[in-house]
């Protein structure tokens, strides 16, 4: 497993070694020991989620507050997405900064988004299936959303006129969001 640092040090790309031949391929998609060594702490995943979306769908920017803050290990198993993490930790030197990574069934990369980040993605292919592990359970009461198009964050989304849920259309401005300390 190759671990790649992003512009935001706590957000990491995990790139598996893929062994292929005329029969197909094999890869180790997750290894707890390698993962914990890379992130520098013990992480216990408690839930796996799987979504399917069509081209142009944008989901985000989502996060949960304590005590239900979630770290996410995300990947795209069908198609391709542009995946984004926004640092919402007030005490961080990268507060308000974002990082974007293309994740696809072809590149098989995964992105680690720790607690204290808002997360979103948009679908670049005709359809995409998105799978992710979380280290905390979903909590409707602690769920929050930041407006995907907030000008103060200025994410360079590679889609025009995205398809959005009502929840994502009505996300909070970054300046009004609930941050992490």
UniProtKB/Swiss-Prot annotation:
Organism name: Shigella flexneri
Reaction(s) catalysed (UniProt annotation): dTDP-4-dehydro-6-deoxy-alpha-D-glucose = dTDP-4-dehydro-beta-L-rhamnose
Chain positions recorded as substrate binding sites: 23, 28, 47-49, 59, 72, 119, 143, 167
EC number: 5.1.3.13
Subunit structure: Homodimer.
CDD domains membership: cupin_RmlC
SUPFAM superfamilies in the record: RmlC-like cupins
Protein name (Swiss-Prot/TrEMBL): dTDP-4-dehydrorhamnose 3,5-epimerase
Gene: rfbC
